[in-house]
């Protein structure tokens, strides 16, 4: 039995090596970007949800640079962030250009910290992304809090203990945008607004549409009437009103989550909406508020987490990323170069929403400024 397992492992390693050398040949020595590395990640039992998100984040350059900079700081106690920094550093400092790395330390820490991921079942990539970004932000804020209490900040100042609002971290600098919820009373025309921060936007999907259309739908005007009337402070009573959500501040990296999993009452479970949703290589949002800080911001698609299968707890996740001027597909330990036109294969299906499909699930757009 042990001999068979050894032979199996050797065969797997040989296959990985063949894939790696084929990738190098396909890119070519002259075209291969300087100081860039393309490494697949070993799957530790349904950890493709994690691998795909990590690959997408690695190719969000501002995020990668901050994680690598964190690695160079004085050694901190082990956390999910130190494990991520070790993994990114390991990829970035490899002698080889292509290959495979086991993210074992990161996966072990993830399973230790959150029981949701402490099993060998398929998990939701969006839930993992959300957990990872919020956990990193919490770690950074706690470290800054400790520095304040010790009276030593990076700028050498001693900060006030009275400031109860956590400082924004580089996670917020990269991913955080602001929505403004505008409500207009239909009686007195008074407009009230409330701001809400986000690290990613979840948008509803429809058949044969585009991400631009989905984002417009995100800002559709909703009428509040009947039992859902709005309490107007000016009128001092409940009134009919119009409510809509607009983007007040666009983030450096816009993470868009397509809500492809819907609970079906008749099935008593979630099923996948494999709708065809076109996502362009370039994007500009038109649902910004009148006082938006950067309404004309242009974005380029840099990564997509793709769900393959028919449901949230079944199937597989892969990532497609843009590196310099070409696209790569990361499928756990396999890395392949693909044509830009091949991205159209991940838009979804034009019919039979419950059929297995490879469809874009999380989109990462990076701003040009």
Curated annotation (Swiss-Prot):
Region (Disordered): 145-165
GO biological process: protein deubiquitination; proteolysis; regulation of protein stability
Keyword Ligase on entry: no
Subcellular location, record wording: Nucleus; Cytoplasm; Cell membrane
Domain USP as annotated: residue spans: 39-368
Residues that bind Zn(2+): 185, 188, 232, 235
Top EC class for this record: hydrolase
Top-level division of the source organism's lineage: Eukaryota
Activity: how regulated: Activated by interaction with WDR20, WDR48 and DMWD through different allosteric mechanisms.
Catalytic activity: Thiol-dependent hydrolysis of ester, thioester, amide, peptide and isopeptide bonds formed by the C-terminal Gly of ubiquitin (a 76-residue protein attached to proteins as an intracellular targeting signal)
Catalytic site positions: 48, 316
Keywords associated with the record: Cell membrane, Cytoplasm, Hydrolase, Membrane, Metal-binding, Nucleus, Protease, Thiol protease, Ubl conjugation pathway, Zinc
Motif segment (Required for plasma membrane localization of USP12/WDR20): 1-4
Pfam families named in the record: UCH
Gene3D superfamilies xrefs: Cysteine proteinases
A single GO cellular-component term on record: cytosol
Subunit annotation: Interacts with WDR48. Interacts with WDR20; this interaction promotes translocation of the USP12 complex to the plasma membrane. Component of the USP12/WDR20/WDR48 deubiquitinating complex. Component of the USP12/WDR20/WDR48 deubiquitinating complex. Interacts with PHLPP1. Interacts with RBPJ. Interacts with CBP; this interaction blocks the acetyltransferase activity of CREBBP.
Function: Deubiquitinating enzyme that plays various roles in the regulation of the immune response and inflammation. During TCR engagement and activation, translocates into the cytoplasm and deubiquitinates its substrates LAT and TRAT1 and prevents their lysosome-dependent degradation to stabilize the TCR signaling complex at the plasma membrane. Plays an essential role in the selective LPS-induced macrophage response through the activation of NF-kappa-B pathway. In addition, promotes that antiviral immune response through targeting DNA sensor IFI16 to inhibit its proteasome-dependent degradation.
Protein name: Ubiquitin carboxyl-terminal hydrolase 12
Protein species of origin: Bos taurus (Bovine)
């Amino acid at each position: 039995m042990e001999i068979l397992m050894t032979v199996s492992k050797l065969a797997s390693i040989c296959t990985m090596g063949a894939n790696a050398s084929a990738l190098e040949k396909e890119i070519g020595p002259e075209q291969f970007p300087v100081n860039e590395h393309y490494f697949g990640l070993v799957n530790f039992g349904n950890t493709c949800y994690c691998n795909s998100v990590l690959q997408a984040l690695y190719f969000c350059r501002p995020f990668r640079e901050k994680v690598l900079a964190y690695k160079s700081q004085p050694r901190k106690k082990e956390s999910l962030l130190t494990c991520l920094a070790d993994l990114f550093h390991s990829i970035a400092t490899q002698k080889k250009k292509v290959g495979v790395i086991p993210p074992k330390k990161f996966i072990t820490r993830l399973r230790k910290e959150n029981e949701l991921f402490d099993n060998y079942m398929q998990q939701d990539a969006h839930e993992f992304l959300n957990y990872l970004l919020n956990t990193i932000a919490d770690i950074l804020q706690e470290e800054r809090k400790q520095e304040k209490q010790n009276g030593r900040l990076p700028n050498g100042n001693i900060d006030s203990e009275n400031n109860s609002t956590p400082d924004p971290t580089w996670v917020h600098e990269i991913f955080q945008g602001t929505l403004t919820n505008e409500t207009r009373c239909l009686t007195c025309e008074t407009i009230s607004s409330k701001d809400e921060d986000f690290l990613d936007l979840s948008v509803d999907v429809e058949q044969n549409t585009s991400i631009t259309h989905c984002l417009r739908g995100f800002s559709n005007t909703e009428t509040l009437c009947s039992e859902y009337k709005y309490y107007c402070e000016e009128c001092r009573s409940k009134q009919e009103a119009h409510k809509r959500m607009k983007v007040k501040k666009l983030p450096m990296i816009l993470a868009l989550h397509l809500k492809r999993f819907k609970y079906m009452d008749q099935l008593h479970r979630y099923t996948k909406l494999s709708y065809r949703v076109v996502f362009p290589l370039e994007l500009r949002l038109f649902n910004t508020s009148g006082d938006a800080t950067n309404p004309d911001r242009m974005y380029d698609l840099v990564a997509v987490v793709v769900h393959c299968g028919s449901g949230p707890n079944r199937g597989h996740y892969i990532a497609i990323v843009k590196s310099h001027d070409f696209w790569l597909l990361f499928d756990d330990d396999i890395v392949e170069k693909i044509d830009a036109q091949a991205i159209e294969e991940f838009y979804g299906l034009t019919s039979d929403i419950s059929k297995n499909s490879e469809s874009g699930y999380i989109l990462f757009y990076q701003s040009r400024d």
